[in-house]
Amino acid sequence: MEVMRILHMNKGNGETSYAKNSIVQSNIISLGRRVMDEALKKLMIRNSEILSFGIADLGCSSGPNSLLSISNIVETIQNLCHDLDRPVPELSLSLNDLPSNDFNYIFASLPEFYDRVKKRDNNYESLGFEHGSGGPCFVSAVPGSFYGRLFPRRSLHFVHSSSSLHWLSQVPCGEVNKKDGVVITADLDNRGKIYLSKTSPKSAHKVYALQFQTDFSVFLRSRSEELVPGGRMVLSFLGRSSPDPTTEESCYQWELLAQALMSLAKEGIIEEENIDAFNAPYYAASPEELKMAIEKEGSFSIDRLEISPVDWEGGSISDDSYDIVRFKPEALASGRRVAKTIRAVVEPMLEPTFGQKVMDELFERYAKLVGEYVYVSSPRYTIVIVSLLRMG
């Protein structure tokens, strides 16, 4: 599976598009807002004389959320500058995602974004910016994988990423051996599943964890080159609170999708061997795994590390004993909404293996499975939010 080509959300504005089914990701951005605002305040106080800030949002995707993060960042900086009685610095805002992302949707949304910036900035016209421009904000798109360098050395002051770092750079390979100096890899043995599960072999657990450590270390090393000393980074993504990578919070949405696929295979609609060959380029990391990677890379210190549970529709959960009693029709309706959210994200990576023609039937079955599960359980995701300081 070529992740660079297939890892993008459903494009456009249709009923199965990411633009219409991304409330969970929007809520995750909101969940990390407090930590982001705190990091920006510390950054602004330390850099009171800087006239221009480099800011990047990594994994921006497309749709209404694509400009939400940088809009929040600009709003926070404007408010901080007002409180600190200083002019708003020029802001170089870079939006990053893979080349397959629908950047045209983002470009079409920029005039509305610029208008919001203008309304919030009383100094807009006095700075010499014309109507229709971005004012002190200069927005650009940077296509490419964030598992590698994207920006010039020491050109960034702040990096943000939400709902992206749970995606891996590639599907993990099987056990790696050396024979006569040649590295040999095998396909991952995870039959009947598309991600880690209770029945996955321990070797699958190992290679998934290793792939995350490799990818996240490359991510940190790349950002350490691009951020100025004292720069900050706030990351939020799907993770887990348990050391066990096969708990419900980290994998059960994939387990139910595998069940839906297997039901199609049993009826001869798709080939079971295609299910055996498919594994999601995804990993829900634990806080301990994050700490290990950050400490090993050595360029960043952890300013804050939090985990927050949300339900499968993105709603906040404030109580550890969270439990909702649902009527059956309500649970099935919830299942349909969850299925549309998942479809908007994973359909582009499923189509090359299973074909476009089966997608409607697949996600109808998936919606029913999710609804039945929601009826008897209260499933949740765990959101990891980490704020990092570039040392030096």
Swiss-Prot record:
<protein>
    <recommendedName>
        <fullName>Jasmonate O-methyltransferase</fullName>
        <ecNumber>2.1.1.141</ecNumber>
    </recommendedName>
</protein>
<comment type="pathway">
    <text>Lipid metabolism; oxylipin biosynthesis.</text>
</comment>
<keyword id="KW-0443">Lipid metabolism</keyword>
<dbReference type="GO" id="GO:0031408">
    <property type="term" value="P:oxylipin biosynthetic process"/>
</dbReference>
<feature type="binding site">
    <location>
        <position position="25"/>
    </location>
    <ligand>
        <name>jasmonate</name>
    </ligand>
</feature>
<feature type="binding site">
    <location>
        <position position="279"/>
    </location>
    <ligand>
        <name>Mg(2+)</name>
    </ligand>
</feature>
<feature type="binding site">
    <location>
        <position position="60"/>
    </location>
    <ligand>
        <name>S-adenosyl-L-homocysteine</name>
    </ligand>
</feature>
<keyword id="KW-0808">Transferase</keyword>
<dbReference type="GO" id="GO:0046872">
    <property type="term" value="F:metal ion binding"/>
</dbReference>
<dbReference type="GO" id="GO:0005634">
    <property type="term" value="C:nucleus"/>
</dbReference>
<feature type="site" description="Involved in substrate discrimination">
    <location>
        <position position="160"/>
    </location>
</feature>
<feature type="binding site">
    <location>
        <position position="145"/>
    </location>
    <ligand>
        <name>S-adenosyl-L-homocysteine</name>
    </ligand>
</feature>
<dbReference type="GO" id="GO:0006633">
    <property type="term" value="P:fatty acid biosynthetic process"/>
</dbReference>
<feature type="binding site">
    <location>
        <position position="278"/>
    </location>
    <ligand>
        <name>Mg(2+)</name>
    </ligand>
</feature>
<comment type="function">
    <text>Catalyzes the methylation of jasmonate into methyljasmonate, a plant volatile that acts as an important cellular regulator mediating diverse developmental processes and defense responses.</text>
</comment>
<keyword id="KW-0539">Nucleus</keyword>
<dbReference type="GO" id="GO:0030795">
    <property type="term" value="F:methyl jasmonate methylesterase activity"/>
</dbReference>
<keyword id="KW-0444">Lipid biosynthesis</keyword>
<feature type="binding site">
    <location>
        <position position="276"/>
    </location>
    <ligand>
        <name>Mg(2+)</name>
    </ligand>
</feature>
<feature type="binding site">
    <location>
        <position position="97"/>
    </location>
    <ligand>
        <name>S-adenosyl-L-homocysteine</name>
    </ligand>
</feature>
<dbReference type="InterPro" id="IPR042086">
    <property type="entry name" value="MeTrfase_capping"/>
</dbReference>
<dbReference type="InterPro" id="IPR005299">
    <property type="entry name" value="MeTrfase_7"/>
</dbReference>
<dbReference type="GO" id="GO:0005737">
    <property type="term" value="C:cytoplasm"/>
</dbReference>
<keyword id="KW-0489">Methyltransferase</keyword>
<feature type="binding site">
    <location>
        <position position="146"/>
    </location>
    <ligand>
        <name>S-adenosyl-L-homocysteine</name>
    </ligand>
</feature>
<feature type="binding site">
    <location>
        <position position="65"/>
    </location>
    <ligand>
        <name>S-adenosyl-L-homocysteine</name>
    </ligand>
</feature>
<comment type="similarity">
    <text>Belongs to the methyltransferase superfamily. Type-7 methyltransferase family.</text>
</comment>
<keyword id="KW-0949">S-adenosyl-L-methionine</keyword>
<dbReference type="InterPro" id="IPR029063">
    <property type="entry name" value="SAM-dependent_MTases_sf"/>
</dbReference>
<feature type="binding site">
    <location>
        <position position="190"/>
    </location>
    <ligand>
        <name>Mg(2+)</name>
    </ligand>
</feature>
<dbReference type="GO" id="GO:0032259">
    <property type="term" value="P:methylation"/>
</dbReference>
<keyword id="KW-0479">Metal-binding</keyword>
<keyword id="KW-0963">Cytoplasm</keyword>
<keyword id="KW-0276">Fatty acid metabolism</keyword>
<feature type="binding site">
    <location>
        <position position="167"/>
    </location>
    <ligand>
        <name>jasmonate</name>
    </ligand>
</feature>
<keyword id="KW-0460">Magnesium</keyword>
<keyword id="KW-0925">Oxylipin biosynthesis</keyword>
<feature type="site" description="Involved in substrate discrimination">
    <location>
        <position position="238"/>
    </location>
</feature>
<feature type="binding site">
    <location>
        <position position="18"/>
    </location>
    <ligand>
        <name>S-adenosyl-L-homocysteine</name>
    </ligand>
</feature>
<dbReference type="Pfam" id="PF03492">
    <property type="entry name" value="Methyltransf_7"/>
</dbReference>
<keyword id="KW-0275">Fatty acid biosynthesis</keyword>
<feature type="binding site">
    <location>
        <position position="98"/>
    </location>
    <ligand>
        <name>S-adenosyl-L-homocysteine</name>
    </ligand>
</feature>
